[in-house]
Regions:
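Short hydrophobic/aromatic helix or loop-helix immediately within or flanking a transmembrane segment
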Residues: 1-24
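Membrane-interface transmembrane helices that cradle and orient dolichyl/undecaprenyl
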Residues: 90-107, 143-144
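Membrane-interface alpha helices of multi-pass inner-membrane proteins
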Residues: 107-126, 130, 164-166
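Membrane-lumen/periplasm interface segments of specific transmembrane helices
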Residues: 161-197
Length: 197
């Protein structure tokens, strides 16, 4: 077995299979679920990109993802559950487009924690790239706000980025602690030490 991750997706799909008496059709349903979720997330990201910049840029963004063989090949994969890679990016983009809305920011903080937490429980692969990519839009906003000498906006963007980064790291560490606790049979330190075996 592969013990260096928790494998939430395997547990989730396994429970559903048992609930439906391991119907042979369930595998196709799970594949389609992952593909549809990825399409929804990428379409929403493209909509937000269009909202932030322009419709043409949003369309190009979507076509680029849609024609990527790498994205298409993993869309239905039950191990990668690829849509979880892009949810943190979507969250930060939504915040970037609605920075002044306090309720949106608060919802984003909570959502970011769970998005990263769930992604890490499914697998730690690419998590650094995902987190860096998530902050790209806000980082660009901060650079523009500083260039425009808009101190209030700069402070808000910086504060928002710091909080989002902090809750994302919290999601990562909570997932590691949960995984280590299980792997170490209640001994977190032992679970962390043995996490690579």
């Amino acid at each position: 077995g592969y013990y260096s991750q928790y494998g939430l997706q395997g547990k989730f799909f396994g429970l559903l299979s048992k609930a439906f008496n391991e119907n042979a059709m369930m595998l196709a349903v799970f594949h389609n679920f992952c593909a549809v979720m990825l399409a929804v997330v990428l379409a929403t990201i493209s909509f937000e990109v269009a909202f932030k910049y322009n419709k043409m840029f949003g369309l190009i963004f979507y076509i680029t993802f849609g024609l990527s063989p790498w994205i298409a090949n993993f869309a239905k994969n039950l191990y990668w559950v690829e849509f979880t890679w892009f949810v943190p990016i979507l969250i930060c983009l939504v915040v970037s487009n609605r920075l002044e809305n306090r309720k949106i920011r608060t919802a984003a903080y909570i959502s970011m924690f769970f998005a990263v937490f769930i992604k890490c429980l499914c697998g730690y692969e690419y998590i650094t790239t995902i987190l860096v990519a998530s902050m790209t839009f806000l980082a660009t906003d901060l650079i523009c706000a500083v260039a425009e000498k808009n101190k209030e906006k700069s402070k808000l963007i910086f504060k928002t980025t710091c909080i989002l980064s902090a809750v994302a790291l919290c999601g990562f560490f909570v997932a590691i602690l949960l995984h280590a606790n299980i792997k170490g049979d209640g001994n977190i330190i032992e679970g962390i030490i043995n996490s690579g075996t």
